[in-house]
Amino acid sequence: MVFNRYALITNCNHKTLGLYYLWFSFLFGIYGFLLSVILRTELYSSSLRIIAQENVNLYNMIFTVHGIIMIFFNIMPGLFGGFGNYYLPILCGSSELAYPRINSISLLLQPIAFILVILSTAAEFGGGTGWTWYPPLSTSLMSLSPVAVDVIVIGLLVSGIASIMSSLNFLTTVMHLRAKGLTLGILSVSTWSLIITSIMLLLTLPVLTGGVLMLLSDLHFNTLFFDPTFAGDPILYQHLLWFFGHPEVYILILPAFGIISHVISTNYSRSLFGNQSMILAMGCIAVLGSVVWVHHMYTTGLEVDTRAFFTSTTILISIPTGTKVFNWLCTYMSTNFGITHSSSLLSLLFICTFTFGGTTGVILGNGAIDVALHDTYYVIAHFHFVLSIGAIIALFTSVSFFQESFFGKTLRENTIIVLWSILFFVGVVLTFLPMHFLGFNVMPRRIPDYPDALNGWNMICSIGSTMTLFGLLIFK
């Protein structure tokens, strides 16, 4: 009985820890989503609505915390931590992960990191820097509360330590605890997605850690790494951040690829079309995704040759990504086109939204076009189509598909589940599709006010956000 009471801090079973990851992801995600509802409530009409003129920095603080929570505390614990912990040992034929106690510690670090990030909102001005924490704003003692930046950075360092421990755990399990005769070549796409994600985390997280530690030392110890007055370079920080920041996008979406591949293959009783090419495509995405970080920085005064190189490599990523979409559709086309399960419907919705988000990414990857669209709502629409719709739908797909394993019972495949799927999908599309048009009208992101001419599109976005909220309320 005592152990049941303290199961969170005493249990080392990989399935139990995976479920805890999913619950944490769900709870943290609700908090982050409600912050986005506040943003859309503010933006439903021009002029300031619910945020007072003298407290407009609250808007900056809300979108900063929203971004950090949804990336580091919703999608990563859900897809990488939850799905990975629960199913990686099973897919490898192992009874347990290599280091169960380290696995337990990495889980316990997640709520600690979350609380630290939330504490930043209690500071006088909050840490309204955006989730990218660009200097000189984040290193200025004049405009923000230094303690808010401190707790955000420390929270992210704690979260990074947890992610690195999980990655080492997964890789060690795959390399040394596989079932006899199960070679790397015959591992499933889902397993390979977690292997590649773990490798990317191990290669890129140390760079982010170095960058934010330099940021902290600039803030408190006068090191002047990023102060151009004393021969520092704020662009150096952008390189360090985005060297992690762009692979992070693929770290978030690769486990989703594994889940969707598994769901489509199992629901339709078909082996995945081009199974080995799917694994190769994920490897290509990981390699190319690690050398395109400068496409976030086209407006920082790059040389033409540099922009040409990063434009080419960015657009090149569409080839392996297109391979994956093609193979998913070919697997689906070899069936009788039926929707056998709610997870089948969700996986098809994922393919549609991910394809659309990837198409807008090809447009943004062009160095000439991005100069016009940089920091507009077009960028927000692009990455929310891939992450907010794509990765989150993949998370719901996994919960729907593995519900019997996770919860010990199966929900009835009744009308309300289909209605929820459609309501949620229509809500998020209605939220983010009009943002492309706002971007073409050059509405800048991170600004709480805008011209009256843009009222129509913004009102549609806010209606979509409300629909999504109602959709989540009926999610079982």
UniProtKB/Swiss-Prot annotation:
Pathway the protein contributes to: Energy metabolism; oxidative phosphorylation
The residues the record assigns to binding Ca(2+) are 42, 448
What's the catalysed reaction? 4 Fe(II)-[cytochrome c] + O2 + 8 H(+)(in) = 4 Fe(III)-[cytochrome c] + 2 H2O + 4 H(+)(out)
- The portions of this protein that span the membrane are 19-39, 61-81, 105-125, 144-164, 194-214, 240-260, 278-298, 309-329, 345-365, 379-399, 415-435, 455-475
Question: From its record, what is one biological process in GO terms?
Answer: mitochondrial electron transport, cytochrome c to oxygen
| Keyword Iron attached | yes
Q: Where does Cu cation bind?
A: 246, 295-296
EC number per UniProt = 7.1.1.9
Query: Its membrane topology, per UniProt?
Result: Multi-pass membrane protein
Q: Where is this cross-link: 1'-histidyl-3'-tyrosine (His-Tyr)?
A: 246-250
What is the predominant subcellular site recorded for this chain? mitochondrion
Arranged from A to Z, the UniProt key words for this protein are: Calcium, Copper, Electron transport, Heme, Iron, Magnesium, Membrane, Metal-binding, Mitochondrion, Mitochondrion inner membrane, Respiratory chain, Translocase, Transmembrane, Transmembrane helix, Transport
- Top-level EC class as recorded in UniProt: translocase
Where, by residue number, does heme a3 bind?
382
Molecular-function annotations in GO:
cytochrome-c oxidase activity; heme binding; metal ion binding
Could you give the subunit structure recorded for this chain?
A: Component of the cytochrome c oxidase (complex IV, CIV), a multisubunit enzyme composed of a catalytic core of 3 subunits and several supernumerary subunits. The complex exists as a monomer or a dimer and forms supercomplexes (SCs) in the inner mitochondrial membrane with ubiquinol-cytochrome c oxidoreductase (cytochrome b-c1 complex, complex III, CIII).
Q: What does this protein do?
A: Component of the cytochrome c oxidase, the last enzyme in the mitochondrial electron transport chain which drives oxidative phosphorylation. The respiratory chain contains 3 multisubunit complexes succinate dehydrogenase (complex II, CII), ubiquinol-cytochrome c oxidoreductase (cytochrome b-c1 complex, complex III, CIII) and cytochrome c oxidase (complex IV, CIV), that cooperate to transfer electrons derived from NADH and succinate to molecular oxygen, creating an electrochemical gradient over the inner membrane that drives transmembrane transport and the ATP synthase.
PANTHER family associated with the record: CYTOCHROME C OXIDASE SUBUNIT 1 (PTHR10422:SF18)
- Listed name of the protein: Cytochrome c oxidase subunit 1
Organism lineage string: Eukaryota, Sar, Alveolata, Apicomplexa, Aconoidasida
